[in-house]
Design a protein with these regions (language model features):
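Intrinsically disordered, low-complexity Pro/Gly/Ser/Thr-rich segments with frequent PxxP/GP/PP motifs
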Residues: 92-127, 216-246
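Bacterial N-terminal signal peptides that target proteins for export
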Residues: 2-25
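Asparagine-centered strand-capping/turn motif at beta-strand->loop junctions
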Residues: 62-66, 122, 194-198
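Beta-sheet-dominated interaction scaffolds and their linkers
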Residues: 38-68, 107, 175-191
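Surface-exposed binding patches on compact interaction domains or structured appendages
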Residues: 41, 66-120, 205, 212-215
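Transition segment at domain starts
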Residues: 152-183
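Sec/Tat signal peptide C-region and signal peptidase I cleavage site
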Residues: 32-38
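Terminal connector regions
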Residues: 123-164, 245-290
Length: 291
């Protein structure tokens, strides 16, 4: 998002949460602006725990790999994953963990080459129903990075990075299903609509193959993407440059499997659907999963 006031521009760098990466360096956004700042990584980017006697704990590690001291504040936001846009902050929600969460420190100083920990402690009230309670823990520099371009315009870069904290009360788990597939002709992307009818979030990756008449057109893998309970996501299968497609009108066969859960306890769901690519300017209807 870009804000400008006369000769001063303030940029809030779009939020990156740990959905596709095992770590995320704040310096990526700062270097994009031509700045040289502290390189800071956050791990883990996703914490999933079950309550034990109503309590759950977690730890976030913030590491400074640069030669400059990093000063930041730590805060929490309620969130969901929007069907098309992904991460979305919420003022509050029934699944908001914040009323039951304590964490410290809320401000920290990370000297070069060191790691600081943020400790999370959730205490769920006995009266709360079984389910998932979640929040995003953000780390944000106390001072924005200021850069000046060749025209003398000053820009402030504010970067934040988040770790998702999921606390589950009771025996709750995700339940994914593939609903439909459609071809986005304008973006030249395959969109797979996946629903989660369970009571816990899931981060699913997808292995997929597209065929026409028995001939393989393209195969690929899509990275983990979060889907909240009773929610759905339009997942883009061919995200990367190497997976770009230019499909001719016709009917194609899309098959593959969803994979989610821990490495030692993966859940798998195979799927097989027809994908119709219309001719001309007609808009394709989503193709539902074969029953």
């Amino acid at each position: 998002m870009l804000f400008s006031n006369q000769n001063v521009g303030v940029i809030s760098v779009p939020i990156r949460t740990a959905l596709h990466l095992s770590s995320w360096a704040l310096s990526a956004a700062l270097l994009w602006a031509g700045a040289s700042e502290a390189q800071v990584s956050l791990s883990p980017l996703k914490i999933e725990v079950k309550t034990n006697r109503g309590q759950a704990q977690g730890v976030i590690n913030i590491t400074n790999t640069s030669n400059e001291t990093f000063r930041a504040r730590v805060y929490a936001e309620s969130f969901t994953y929007n069907r098309d846009k992904g991460f979305e902050s919420l003022p509050s929600s029934p699944s908001d963990l914040r009323p039951y969460l304590q964490f410290s420190p809320r401000e920290l100083v990370v000297p070069p080459g060191t790691t600081r920990r943020v400790r999370l402690n959730a205490r769920l009230a006995p009266s709360l129903p079984a389910g998932e309670y979640r929040t995003m823990i953000f780390t944000e520099p106390l001072k924005p990075n200021t850069v000046k371009n060749g025209n003398g315009i000053t820009t402030n870069i504010i970067t934040r990075v988040g770790s998702a904290f999921f606390v589950r009360k009771g025996d709750v788990r995700p339940n994914l299903m593939v609903d439909s597939v459609r071809w986005n002709a304008e973006a030249k992307k395959i969109q797979l609509l996946v629903r989660n009818s369970g009571k816990a979030s899931a981060y699913t990756s997808i292995k997929w193959t597209l065929k026409q008449g028995g001939t393989v057109v393209k195969s690929g893998e899509s990275p983990d993407t979060g889907i909240v309970p009773d929610g759905d996501r339009n997942l883009i299968l061919n995200q990367s440059k190497k997976d770009e497609l230019a499909l001719s009108p016709g009917t194609y066969q899309l098959s593959g499997e969803l994979l989610w859960g821990e490495d030692n306890d993966k859940s798998k769901l195979p799927f097989k659907l027809d994908l119709t690519v219309p001719g001309g300017n007609s808009t394709p209807s989503p193709t539902r999963k074969r029953r």
